[in-house]
């Protein structure tokens, strides 16, 4: 699987917005985007006029990077979203939100989606009582995500819960912090996604 090895803060500066890729650091004055809110490189401060295609492409890249999804899988999500009932763009965001790694992050059981993927691959969580190691699994209403007791002392899990209040737990999820257990109460709705995303641009890009 392809992997981005450059500084993650450069991605935020490239997209012109915080992508919250580094967990707790993004909420501090150490955030590189807060200190240098312009694109990286020698000509980063120069604003270039963008074509409609470039605007659509940047929006797609931004969303891909937020959720940590490669192009092939992102396009597959779009195909499924386009075939499903409802609005294609909203369906696409729902598929991304229902990824297990995103749910673990949203519950506050990991500092970032990157960390959530690492923890899942190491078998730290259970899904409906069964050990799971696939970050891209889609959760459904009624599913429960839990940290078994033997894994609750892992520092990154315990530390993550201390900052969940800063970003909040979405209404479609419920967390019992005392038992490290989260439940999917409902499917995510468009209004549950507070991050600035214009999904219509992505639909236009893939519809060409």
Curated annotation (Swiss-Prot):
This is Small ribosomal subunit protein uS4. Part of the 30S ribosomal subunit. Contacts protein S5. The interaction surface between S4 and S5 is involved in control of translational fidelity. One of its GO terms (biological process) is ribosomal small subunit biogenesis. Keywords: Ribonucleoprotein, Ribosomal protein, RNA-binding, rRNA-binding. SUPFAM superfamilies: Alpha-L RNA-binding motif. Belongs to the universal ribosomal protein uS4 family. GO terms for molecular function: rRNA binding; structural constituent of ribosome. PANTHER family: 30S 40S RIBOSOMAL PROTEIN, SMALL RIBOSOMAL SUBUNIT PROTEIN US4M. GO terms for cellular component: small ribosomal subunit. InterPro entries: Ribosomal_uS4 (IPR022801), Ribosomal_uS4_bac-type (IPR005709), Ribosomal_uS4_CS (IPR018079), Ribosomal_uS4_N (IPR001912), S4_RNA-bd (IPR002942), S4_RNA-bd_sf (IPR036986). It comes from the Bacteria. One of the primary rRNA binding proteins, it binds directly to 16S rRNA where it nucleates assembly of the body of the 30S subunit. PROSITE patterns: RIBOSOMAL_S4, S4. Residues 98-158 form the S4 RNA-binding domain.
